[in-house]
UniProtKB/Swiss-Prot annotation:
The keyword Transferase does not apply. Gene3D superfamilies: Aldolase class I. PROSITE patterns: OMPDECASE (PS00156). The active site is at K63. Catalyzes the decarboxylation of orotidine 5'-monophosphate (OMP) to uridine 5'-monophosphate (UMP). Coiled coil: none annotated. The gene is pyrF. This is Orotidine 5'-phosphate decarboxylase. It comes from Dictyoglomus turgidum (strain DSM 6724 / Z-1310). Its EC number is 4.1.1.23. It is an enzyme of class 4 (lyase). It comes from the Bacteria.
């Protein structure tokens, strides 16, 4: 059983060496790390294995989105890496979701484990309502679209969803059953400084009901990542203790 701690450090780097250097510095304090599309495309399964050798929990965030057969076969290969979490796009549709859930459920049963958590991506945190309409042609408001997709994720059996901090309360108040909510778009201040549109501080996101916080650049691009981690821990420690 993994001890719960809500911070996941996103290793969003274009090279394996830099990612592992950061992980080595932080692993005494943080055990959860995210490997996204950029890093995985460079380092492949080796980066996941290297991180796991450090004793970490690895979130493989590839946001799978393809025909059901392709997604299931890809998931099957990712499961061999024993990830902590895996993502796919809810927009991939009901059949893709159900087939993915079936495979992951069989894996969990066979291996007597509750991991990986299978998570569905709702609406990317770089999107706003104008982007939603112009890029996807969807007339729902952004919160309505997030809720619609989260409900589909729940109906098809996913463990949780990826959603911005702005939609946490909406999901907590409207989903029929509790689901994991994993939250990107976490920044140490409310000031917008990059491509993330819907952001929030770590404490605010946890107070609203997020289970896990994905934090990348504020930690990994800091001159002193350890200091940033300690600052975040001091802000949220009482909330974490109440959940243990």
């Amino acid at each position: 059983m993994r001890k719960y701690y809500p911070i996941i450090v996103a290793l969003d780097f274009p090279e394996e060496k830099r990612a592992l250097e950061i992980a080595e510095k932080l692993v005494p304090y943080i055990k959860n790390f995210k490997v996204g599309l950029e890093l995985f495309s460079v380092a492949g399964p080796h980066i996941v294995k290297a991180l796991k050798e450090m004793g970490t929990n690895v979130f493989i965030d590839l946001k799978l989105f393809d025909i059901p057969n392709t997604v299931v076969r890809t998931l099957d290969r990712l499961l061999a890496l024993e990830p902590f979490m895996v993502t796919l796009h809810i927009l991939g549709g009901e059949e893709m979701l159900r087939e993915s859930v079936k495979l992951v459920s069989q894996y969990k049963e066979s291996n007597k484990t509750e991991y990986p958590y299978l998570l569905g991506v709702t609406v990317l945190t770089s999107f706003n309502e104008e982007t939603l309409r112009r890029s996807w042609g969807i007339s729902r408001s952004l919160p309505e679209q997030v809720l619609f997709l989260a409900q589909l994720a729940q109906e098809t059996g996913l463990d949780g969803v990826i959603a911005s901090p702005w939609e946490i309360e909406l999901l907590r108040n409207n989903l029929k059953r509790p689901m994991l909510i994993v939250t990107p778009g976490i920044r140490l201040t409310k000031e917008k400084t990059d491509d993330q549109q819907r952001i929030m501080t770590p404490r605010e996101a946890l107070e609203r009901g997020s289970d896990y916080l994905v934090i990348g650049r504020p930690i990994t691009q800091s001159p002193d990542p350890y200091e940033v981690i300690q600052n975040i821990r001091s802000q949220i420690e009482d909330i974490v203790e109440s959940r243990l």
